[in-house]
């Protein structure tokens, strides 16, 4: 026991060193469950610090816990029991954190078997020394007053607490030595050594996230995760992301985030499902997938067949097909289909655009967004399609492009049942049903739903063609049309039919061709009920009913419904038809 007194004088780790203090305002923000959890964790921290030969008289701690209990009546009598006191704060006798102290004997050990020493300790002769706050002084004064009036009763109760403390500590040490995990999860049967660890696991299972970030509203199951998350906001504001990707220049706050991001460039998928052999780049993706094989209850999307194991995820996914955007920003009235996107957007109103592009002057909230934007000026495209070798500035653009090959159309119009590969395409299409054609061409009086469509159309009248082919000198109004045209010179046909191996230069040509195999004819004439494979053929067919013949021969004034018919007719005047006949004969 002599060694114990020496260790005390040298200032061992005290409960104050590992405790977490709440201000009055913070304490009032916690609900009853969080307060109860706080007390439970503090009790557990203390029990891990305690040694049998080094503990303070328990009445001081009991009074402190009682004060905490009075500040939150909803906790009931859980802290008033002496059994809880035996596991709570011990000395707190370090010089720097002396909030309350009822013993100042540095030369003698605190031996509970010595009643005289215990008695002198609780006479109140030694005054409490408070260096932190008035609350601690008040607490010590109350303790000293209570000790003077009830010293005899406390001496008797102390013997009872000693016996309980020794037995409890022995059981605790025994559990540590034999590796016992007394706290069992009723759902999965997994055991934990502490109640706090069990609580974290239960919150993970139920999805309860009591720790919320006051900047972005993101929630966490553990306080430590919240603290780590707050550091990301500090780094974003300071613009300090030490880990940089060599391929695209994007920076990250953590090395693990950089390693995870690097898989996008390498295409590495190291996590493989043992059941079906499907591989994933991330462990979270594999875990999510494995629920398909193990889960009893699941929700399947009737449109795309995707399976979900949580109803909230299924409902969130379903808005992709319906185009519903329930989350609306009150400041700019912009709507979002998912709460995650909405929460990310709200940051734009609270932050300042401190990152400015030197080339065009455009400003951004986040440094990574500026770096992504800067690729427009440098021409850097780090993301490459493995099918057609096309390059992209952003990974999201690559994923969107890859849907061309998979034929996946996630977004469905509920009015006309038309499907789209992009959410933006669906939104643009839906305006056909909801909005009038307000944009009118001054030259030909044609109306359009979108201003961009009107501007594109006006180039027909102005003859504006900014995009010129270097091979043949042909010009085009759109860059995408030029890229498709250039495949004529290169012979590239990236879109291949899986049925007959026929290849095409455009995705639309492939889709039209595939209707030959499926027999699909989605375009129906309202006049005669005839079904046709393409919209262009339908428009040409409808001219039969209207009598419209817009294509006129300049030689003989004869008119035709289709331009191909006019070209065929013009060969009569040029003599091309006779030449072909003569060559055949």
UniProtKB/Swiss-Prot annotation:
> Which CDD domains would you find in this protein's record?
KRAB_A-box
Keyword vocabulary terms for this entry: DNA-binding, Metal-binding, Nucleus, Repeat, Transcription, Transcription regulation, Zinc, Zinc-finger
Q: Where is this region: Required for nuclear localization?
A: 1-167
Q: Which domain of life is it from?
A: Eukaryota
Which GO biological process entries does UniProt record here?
A: regulation of DNA-templated transcription
GO annotation, cellular component aspect: nucleus
Which coarse location class applies to the principal site listed for this UniProt protein? nucleus
Which intervals hold domain KRAB?
A: 13-95
Q: What family is reported?
A: Belongs to the krueppel C2H2-type zinc-finger protein family.
- What is the stated purpose of this protein? May be involved in transcriptional regulation.
Indicate what this protein is called per its UniProt record.
Zinc finger protein 54
Q: Which organism is it from?
A: Mus musculus (Mouse)
